[in-house]
Amino acid sequence: VAQFRQDRMTERERLEALLNRQQVDRVAFFPIHGSFAAAMVGYSKVDVYENPEMAFWARLRTQEMFGQVERVSYSGGAFGAREFGSEVKMPTSEYSMTISLLKAAVQSEEDVWKLKVPDVKTAGVLPMMMRFSKLQAEYGLPISFNSGGILTIAGYIAGVERMCRWMIRRPELVHKLCRIVTDFLVAIAEYWVETFGPERMIPGTLAPTEANQIISPKQFEEFCLPYQKEVHEKLFGLGVKHIFTHVCGEQNLNLPLWAQIPMGDPGIVSFGNEVDLETASKYFPNDIIMGNVEPAVIQTGTPEQVYELSRICLQKGKKHPSGFFLGPGCDIPPKSPPYNVWTMRKAINDFGWYN
């Protein structure tokens, strides 16, 4: 039977200390879970994307179950798709994890030039996101909204394949998309800050389409860097202090460019398992880093494999001067054995203490 050491801080105290660049007792646990949280409390995957109350309680109760940092977030799935008129497919099959794009709103070059920033109070899932944020505020949690990634959202508007073709053949169209997305994200930020104030905000930039499996570093530099940097800078101008950024997938070649984007004081930067945490530490010495146990191993591996990957992450992450969260390299897959996830928390008990 596992015997855990007595914590000297609550999860809330631990998060506050890290955000204020203070010492903590041990590494905090920060699993990213959407569909997995639904499975933990007996909800369907669709429930946690279409019902903000169910999404909130699934995440909060899963957080309580595993003893994780007090931050839960909600983006409605495929964020940017429905807000601009794209059609989506719900995760109704056994192995689907999240909402996927069915038909992009932008089908032609003419559609790009007609595109306008939607009303952030009424478009798509934004009313549900606002309801979720009001629950965050009610329960004293950090308040979240979407702050990127630029190309991920543009891909939900135009389709990733079409967007990638245009990067080569019609780059002005992609720049137009990125401009619209940037203005959209800033408008969301202004609405959220006007509603709640900036003090408890930790918005989220989620960037899977920016991965080098899809685009080159040169394309990242042209189409993502200036726009994502602008969004983050405007958020800080509104009084936001911290941004959570998930650098998803294989992005080693993009890291020097991501490092040019301000993340906060400090920011929280999460990495896919393709990025070594020691490399991440070198590029983001002043931010909290997070990661990055391989999600596929969490779902299909043995508890011993998950425990060993967690130990390696802890060994590397604990050396990072600005703080570290142990978490998965991306969303925890919905079919993951709960014991495998708990094993990550056990590894923190065994290897994650600072003194």
What residues fall within each predicted segment?
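Membrane helical hairpin/interfacial module
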Residues: 57-87
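Membrane-interface helix-loop-helix modules in multi-pass inner-membrane proteins
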Residues: 101-113
